[in-house]
Amino acid sequence: MFNRFKRALIGRPLTNKAIKNEKYGVIWGLPILSSDAISSVAYAGEEILLVLLPAIGFMAYKNLLYISAAIISLLLILTFSYIQTIENYPNGGGAYIVASDNLGKIAGVVAGAALSVDYILTVAVSVSSGVDQITSAFLFLRPYSILICIAIVLILMIGNLRGIRESSRIFGVPTYAFVFGIVAMLIAGIVKIKGGYVPPTTPLKAVEPVTLFLLLRAFSNGCSALTGVEAVSNAVPNFKEPSVKRAITVLILLSSIVLISFGGISVLISMYHITAGDKAVIIQLANEIFGRGFMFYYITATTFIILVMASNTAYSGFPLLLAIMAKEGHMPRQLNKRGDRLSYSNGIILLSVLATVLIVAFRANVTSLIGLYAIGVFISFTLSQTGMAKRWITTRSKNWFIKAIINGTGAIVTAIVVIIVGITKFREGAWIVIIVIPVLVFMMLKINKHYRAVAVQLRVSPEDLQCIKISENHYRNRVIVPIESINKASIRALRYARTISEHVIAFNVSIDEESGEKIKKRYAMLNTDIPLIVKYSPFRRIVEPLLKFIESEEYNYKKGDMITVILPQFVVRKRWHNILHNKTRVYIEKELLKHKHIVVATMPLQLHDDDDIEDKCKKEQ
């Protein structure tokens, strides 16, 4: 039943050969990878105003344009840098691969950890922001914000579990719809002003002077418009061939849309003197330009959808990033395994769970989540820019000096943003990210250390392979079958034990002499020459008496012998039946596996369905 439900939810399994059909081109690659960056324009200008308006009043609008121009300049630098990254690192991984290759393993892990945190926050911020936009238009939905967010994350998870191709179709159309709405609003807004419309003005007084630190704070807030630019470089392997060419085309289109949308909205905010308040800035603009007509609701709906879809960029990048890191040994190997629909399903589920935890913990509050946002992605920006600058200096390829200057400038600017965000948003939540990233780096390095240690212990050199003779009897095998009672499962285990060794014993641990005598009498009825050893354990311990017996002279165990412990097991038909039976076998297996001379095997006995047995009993009566 579970499998049928799973198939209905995410579709039938796909073969490995179908992976080529799961890749996307420019038309669908653009919306699925650009939704994060494009959606940022819906709130980036608002984040700048939240810093400037309370401090310098009406002067905020003029400074908003200057700050927007600076952010657009940084966008162009990042675009150039990531084009070079795509050309030089076509296997994906973005900042993680660039930093690892040029700055060393630790720098790469820091970039990977920072980018992972940013992807998780992208889902939490985008979904919360989208719900905030829709509840700004429909206030009666405000009390249900958290539940709506959780439902949306669940839908996103299911959509992405269905595979890359299907998710690109599902989540692609809203991006184009949003871009159309924004362009229409930009044109209509400018035409309306040129036609003589005078927007209402709210008196706003400055309460403090324009300082460099104030402008830097506003700049760092507005840099949220740049989040998502790195997504294309992380997902190059998801493109159809020629993947590099298609990825670069998507990146250029993405940057062009962000430039026009973000720059245009900043101009409209200044023209219409929009304030940052209870209602989202983009909703206020739509209301001012179109009134409460069709286009107002169109902008509201597409803004909500694009903000939600922005998180789909994370669903494209996060699982792939973790898969690459898992392949390198910095994350659990399970994250490098594709699911039934050829998506990295474990990464998708992990992202959904972590994003949901954040949404619930911060009660879907965008302002609180924004405090954590951006610092992670700008750390990865800085490391990526620094890595590319070093690459040009090292390789000295064509135009290397100009490229190094551009990347070096980008590295300095993004590093400044990291410092500003870290300082200005420390109390707002940035401290959490500042702590979490080093913890993640430590965890990833420990994981890598473990995998390397395992590899060293398992490695067999070609020279050793030629000397090993598996045909020889390397071990003398002795078998022990622990039995709790004499039943079909234990008898089946004893029969199997006899087929693999002549040295077999049955072993029972009883809590008192009375129960021990009972099992001895019942075992005596069994037609077998396998001896039964009964040990008493008044403290109800099970494994200790068995291990003590193995090491005793009574057992006559010799160094070099291998002991196979066969555990009888019955397998129930329904999963919930498992909770009705104790897990003694699991505990015994766990403890015995700590000893290198002991092999643990299970002998299963499949039980029939309860209803079938009940019907059989009724017939026999």
Label for each model-derived stretch:
Residues 1-55, 80, 91, 99-106, ...:
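Membrane-interface "cap" regions at the ends of multi-pass membrane proteins
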Residues 3, 48-100, 105-112, 125-152, ...:
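Extracellular loop-to-transmembrane helix junctions
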Residues 176, 181-227, 424, 428, ...:
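Helix-loop-helix junctions that connect adjacent transmembrane segments
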